[in-house]
Amino acid sequence: MILNRQKKVPLAEQPLSEFLGKILQELNFAQAEVSIAFVSDAEMAKWNRDFRHKNGPTDVLSFPALSKRRADRHAKRKDAVVKSPVTAGGFLGDIAIAPQTARRFARANGRTLDNEIRILMLHGVLHLMGYDHESKSDLGQMNRIEQKLRRRLGLA
């Protein structure tokens, strides 16, 4: 489900909803549900402060429905990208994306806003599945999986 709660950056919700479906299908989660809210920088800054104790907006936040322990167990599986955990078909969680921040990052990285938003959607879904980048080994694992999926999904 896509919910656009901001007005500063125009978004085409239907193509983004379809792309979310492609991400979930690629991960063998076609029946799973994810909600993505596009929020203002001000709202994202508040959430970033409340949930991560960091000042200012970030580009994406994920709020997994899976317990951390079960998500970690799934993320450590070698076949995690192609095998669904017990929760497949259920609600994976919520993702918040700040399009204004995404637009700044897109410009800085030479990408289109549409491409940046899709990359953030993928990144957020991986977090919902338990992947993380808090340690070097976690970062390496998540980056490998994300790069593989970016290629499969046609993202630069």
Give the predicted meaning of each segment:
Residues 1-118, 126-156:
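An acidic/histidine-cluster motif and surrounding catalytic segment
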